[in-house]
Amino acid sequence: MAKLIVSDLDVKDKKVLIRVDFNVPIKDGKIGDDNRIVAALPTIKYVIEHDGKAILFSHLGRIKSEDDKKGLSLRPVAERLSNLLNKPVTFVPVTEGEQLETAINNMNDGDVLVVENTRFEDVVNGEQVKRESGNDPELGKYWASLGDVYVNDAFGTAHRSHASNVGIASNMDQVAAGFLMEKEIKFLGDAVDNPKHPFVAILGGAKVSDKIGVIDHLISKADKIIIGGGMTYTFYAAKGMGIGNSLVEKDKIELAKSIIEKAGDKLVLPSDSIVAEKFDNDVPSKVVEGSIPDGYMALDIGPKSIEEFEDVLRDAKTVVWNGPMGVFEMSNYAKGTLEIGKFLGTLSDATTIVGGGDSTAAVKQLGVGDKLTHISTGGGASLEYLEGKELPGIAAISEK
């Protein structure tokens, strides 16, 4: 069934509650990367251009104490949003009460208002009560009472059941997806349920345990699953290969064995690695094929692996990439990740979808973002979606 989209709603004269994902990096009141704010603009603009009142909810960071609140106000985000929209944005420094209600009642059609960080509700009078992240039913009901319709455009939190997404939605007659949410559901959904073949998944990162559900779910769907990053060496161990001092999840070796058996020749592991004696960008490194020698740890895929992976990707029609090929934050071990990102940018006939912090950062660093079909805004959410799980935030959106 298709989901209701914001453009299906009549928003004129309506108070439209929009859950956005403004969880951006902020240091000393300065925003490091405003991509998530930019990504929400189409939905916000649609509402205000159609004479609705846009009331925005978002979390920012994690709030475990009153102290945490000091550096995690959404005020700088509201200011940046005002610049991007080129119009005034009202910021309300509270999450409930008369000040918020009055500000909403004073809105005119086409106005934009940002409510303070929803996770401020997780700590009340110094006590950790988790009203937002624990989906307190009274809070969801209260927030829902502030508007007429609800739009969820925060894919990044769709795998969480919070008061500001599932809580509000369960108290509303009409719940629609924003344009960003619609895009995520479309591209990730098609990749998993209706991919063009050959379909290749590239999964990297440190831990098998983070990606196990995805690998398991994609074995039957993908033509090839390329493995990179630290989790490679748990698979090496499962094959009886030497891993030196490389990262390994000993309690996942049996699981890796069963994946190797189940996947057969669909599973593509690196054939060579860049190794060093210490987890350090400045110590000498070398390329080794196959097993990792004693006293060394693998920190990136090697040149031969890059070539072999590119050969697999060359004819792909659908590619989903999540997770780095090596220790991306160290420049000497970022090459595998960067080369894969660069190569994906050349696949003009394929649907290419990238998710996960390091993969996304690599794509941005290379400037190939516009050559890819879709860059997912949700880390954990996109992984759970690729696992075939139903995400609470999406389940709560009305069907057409």
Swiss-Prot record:
Q: What residues does substrate bind to? A: 21-23, 36, 59-62, 119, 160
Its GO biological process terms? Answer: gluconeogenesis; glycolytic process
Q: Which Gene3D superfamilies match?
A: Phosphoglycerate kinase, N-terminal domain
* UniProt keyword annotations, A-Z: ATP-binding, Cytoplasm, Glycolysis, Kinase, Nucleotide-binding, Transferase
Enzyme kind, highest EC tier = transferase
Q: In which pathway does it act?
A: Carbohydrate degradation; glycolysis; pyruvate from D-glyceraldehyde 3-phosphate: step 2/5
Its localization reads: Cytoplasm
Q: Which GO terms describe its molecular function?
A: ADP binding; ATP binding; phosphoglycerate kinase activity
Keyword S-adenosyl-L-methionine (UniProt): no
| Matches recorded under SUPFAM superfamilies | Phosphoglycerate kinase
Q: What is its EC number?
A: 2.7.2.3
Pfam families (alphabetical)? PGK (PF00162)
Q: Which residues are noted in the entry as ATP-binding?
A: 211, 329, 356-359
Q: Which reaction does it catalyse?
A: (2R)-3-phosphoglycerate + ATP = (2R)-3-phospho-glyceroyl phosphate + ADP
- Principal localization reads cytoplasm
Q: Does the keyword Protease apply?
A: no
Against CDD domains, the record matches this protein to: Phosphoglycerate_kinase
| Family listed | Belongs to the phosphoglycerate kinase family.
Q: How does it assemble?
A: Monomer.
Q: What is this protein called?
A: Phosphoglycerate kinase
This chain's source organism reads Lactiplantibacillus plantarum (strain ATCC BAA-793 / NCIMB 8826 / WCFS1) (Lactobacillus plantarum)
Q: Which gene encodes it?
A: pgk
